């Protein structure tokens, strides 16, 4: 059995750790609340954009746009969202693990034809370990989501797609569903799949608009806005998922510390009782000698 001094030292150490994890949980919870508020403030605008897009797609005429043209994939770009720091459970590990699966799918293209955009220091480190060179430094976006920076990244990807420098763009991120649930999500960013949008037509009555000067001109303005907003939405989504994962990880760590403290307290009391018993036996034995 461990000595009283050893057990007492372990109790103090676990208690200090519990204070740290509890404080980190409160900080992560506050950041999560802020991230959720940012998403809620942005949702009305995003929903309105998608509503307009759905209305246009309900028309009989086919929409023409270079952003919806599918072509043979010879070069692909993957934007991967993670965090700058750890202590958030399997948040980063799951992203990197799934990224390796995607990279295996595109192995036939060659490493030079798979472009990686890592958003977050942890995934940037993972990309480097996998032998790839990042297309830029986007670490700051993971901590402080900015529409301007997300829009700039979207513009760069749109430009490269239009110039046929890349044939497809994918997004890999954690989708925030609740504090306890974050869903690993893989989406095609470019080309835009309008068939998914057209499914909304059957869900309700679509207003009949007269579009001037033409649907194609309006869509030429609308689709880039949708793409910029999509990038920002995913950035906010990943940020909220990170804070949710860290909140849960710190909650679990705090609960485990509480359980360990209870076990150590029982151990300490048993050790103390054993020490007192031994002293009494020594005293009794000495008096009878």
Curated annotation (Swiss-Prot):
<dbReference type="InterPro" id="IPR000131">
    <property type="entry name" value="ATP_synth_F1_gsu"/>
</dbReference>
<keyword id="KW-0813">Transport</keyword>
<protein>
    <recommendedName>
        <fullName>ATP synthase gamma chain</fullName>
    </recommendedName>
</protein>
<dbReference type="GO" id="GO:0045259">
    <property type="term" value="C:proton-transporting ATP synthase complex"/>
</dbReference>
<dbReference type="GO" id="GO:0005524">
    <property type="term" value="F:ATP binding"/>
</dbReference>
<keyword id="KW-0139">CF(1)</keyword>
<dbReference type="GO" id="GO:0005886">
    <property type="term" value="C:plasma membrane"/>
</dbReference>
<dbReference type="GO" id="GO:0046933">
    <property type="term" value="F:proton-transporting ATP synthase activity, rotational mechanism"/>
</dbReference>
<keyword id="KW-0375">Hydrogen ion transport</keyword>
<keyword id="KW-0066">ATP synthesis</keyword>
<keyword id="KW-1003">Cell membrane</keyword>
<dbReference type="InterPro" id="IPR035968">
    <property type="entry name" value="ATP_synth_F1_ATPase_gsu"/>
</dbReference>
<keyword id="KW-0406">Ion transport</keyword>
<comment type="subunit">
    <text>F-type ATPases have 2 components, CF(1) - the catalytic core - and CF(0) - the membrane proton channel. CF(1) has five subunits: alpha(3), beta(3), gamma(1), delta(1), epsilon(1). CF(0) has three main subunits: a, b and c.</text>
</comment>
<keyword id="KW-0997">Cell inner membrane</keyword>
<comment type="similarity">
    <text>Belongs to the ATPase gamma chain family.</text>
</comment>
<dbReference type="GO" id="GO:0042777">
    <property type="term" value="P:proton motive force-driven plasma membrane ATP synthesis"/>
</dbReference>
<keyword id="KW-0472">Membrane</keyword>
<dbReference type="Pfam" id="PF00231">
    <property type="entry name" value="ATP-synt"/>
</dbReference>
<comment type="function">
    <text>Produces ATP from ADP in the presence of a proton gradient across the membrane. The gamma chain is believed to be important in regulating ATPase activity and the flow of protons through the CF(0) complex.</text>
</comment>
């Amino acid at each position: 059995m461990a000595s009283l001094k050893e057990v007492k030292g372990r109790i103090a150490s676990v208690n200090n750790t519990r204070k740290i994890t509890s404080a980190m949980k409160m900080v992560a919870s506050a950041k999560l609340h802020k991230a959720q508020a940012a998403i809620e403030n942005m949702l009305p605008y995003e929903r309105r954009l998608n509503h307009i897009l759905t209305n246009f797609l309900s028309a009989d005429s086919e929409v023409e746009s270079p952003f919806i043209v599918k072509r043979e994939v010879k070069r692909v770009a993957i934007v991967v969202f993670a965090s700058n720091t750890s202590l958030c459970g399997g948040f980063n590990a799951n992203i990197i693990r799934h990224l390796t699966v995607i990279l295996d799918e595109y192995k036939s293209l060659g490493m030079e034809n798979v472009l990686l955009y890592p958003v977050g220091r942890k995934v940037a480190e993972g990309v480097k370990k996998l032998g790839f060179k990042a297309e830029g430094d986007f670490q700051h976006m993971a901590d402080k989501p900015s529409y301007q920076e997300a829009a700039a990244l979207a513009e760069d990807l749109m430009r490269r797609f239009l110039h046929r420098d890349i044939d497809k763009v994918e997004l890999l991120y954690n989708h925030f569903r609740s504090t306890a649930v974050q869903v690993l999500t893989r989406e095609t960013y470019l080309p835009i799949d309008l068939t998914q949008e057209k499914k909304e037509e059957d869900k309700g009555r679509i207003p009949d608009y007269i579009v001037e000067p033409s649907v194609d001109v309006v869509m030429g303005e609308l689709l880039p806005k949708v793409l910029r907003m999509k990038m920002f939405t995913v950035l906010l989504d990943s940020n909220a998922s990170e804070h949710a994962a860290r909140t849960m990880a710190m909650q679990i760590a705090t609960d485990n510390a509480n359980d360990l403290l209870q076990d150590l307290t029982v151990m300490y009391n048993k050790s103390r009782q054993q020490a007192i018993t031994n002293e009494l036996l020594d005293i009794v034995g000495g008096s009878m000698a």
